[in-house]
Amino acid sequence: MLDIKFIRENPDAVRENIKKKFQDAKLPLVDQVLALDEENRAAVSEANELRANRNALSKQVGMLMGQAKKDPSKLEEAEAVKAQVKANADRLAELEAKETELAQQIRHIMLQIPNIIDPSVPIGPDDSCNVEVQRFGEPVVPDFEIPYHTQIMESFNGIDMDAAGRVSGNGFYYLMGDIARLHEAVLAYARDFMINKGFTFCIPPFMIHGNVVEGVMSQTEMDAMMYKIEGEDLYLIGTSEHSMIGKFIDQIIPEESLPQTLTSYSPCFRKEKGAHGIEERGVYRIHQFEKQEMVVVCKPEDSMKWYEQMWRYSVELFRSLDIPVRQLECCSGDLADLKVKSCDIEAWSPRQQKYFEVCSCSNLGDAQARRLKMRVKGEKGTYLPHTLNNPVVAPPRMLIAFLENNLQADGTVKIPAVLQPYMGGTQMLTPKQ
């Protein structure tokens, strides 16, 4: 969400940004919010004048009532002033109700206007225009056929999607045995990896209030992702970023405590009602998964430095697991409305001979802070912090990349050295079938 003052002073820049994001249908919102803002400021100005006059008129009534004891003619004048005081009070009540209504209308529109993207963001309508920046690690081109990832898991008796379908429907799975151990090992390794980078480990709430949802994401994202608890003001989180950033709602953060660097574990729940939907056969896009997340709350001048550092953490972690990756700069049309800048980290799939998304690092500027009324108190006053997020690792997508890149010709799966302590010293997984 932008500052209304910024929109007021830079309407053309806001319109141009909307065009860069290929959201021309939102262009009328700028004029709408400016008209409402002008109407609201007029109401506020009139209300302030009435409040200022209220005390003066009240004093005048008191003075006239005192004079009326000696001069009865003053009583009529006092009653006239009393009538004016009542009329002003009635008008003030009308104006205050109008201000409340206008503020709600303005906020509703403001929540739909996208954040100003960074000048470095490539311009394009959708993810087909995302730009490859660099690659890390040599892509594996095996001389043997790599099965589909669920077939690899099934060779270890490690997954049962049929049973999950009977219990929960499509988009769920049972992980078992070595694959379940591997899943937990990757999460534990990712947790310790971030702790060693200086991040504070946290397990957050897995359900959040509606005002937190509104504060961390757009309505479009909310409709496509979030499960609501029936009869409660609670939503299941789609990522722990939601509850981690929500931790600071309505809070004043001491400047000396910045940056806040947090890494969190949580299950994640998603409706996946967007363009892609859930995957019919595999575990790439599903309704429930677990994830280790990283979140940073920092000074505005430090956010781009943290952005660079955070996506590099993802690259370092994936490379430590012998998975080649590449960085992809997200274009304007692929950025969610709150994002200033974002890049995807994609892992190499030897089976498909192409890369696929496993992480998305995002700088949201002060958008979430403004929505959630977060403030930082420093020597020069208060200001809005910047927020950033990036998945450390999100099994089962990580498992797809891990299994394909560490699969051997005989069906065994090599366990990289960094992961072996989390697998009880196991160096190789041997298929059961």
Model-derived segments and spans:
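N-terminal alpha-helical targeting/anchoring segments
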Residues: 1-139, 154, 158
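TRNA-recognition modules of translation machinery and tRNA-sensing kinases, especially anticodon-binding
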Residues: 27, 135-433
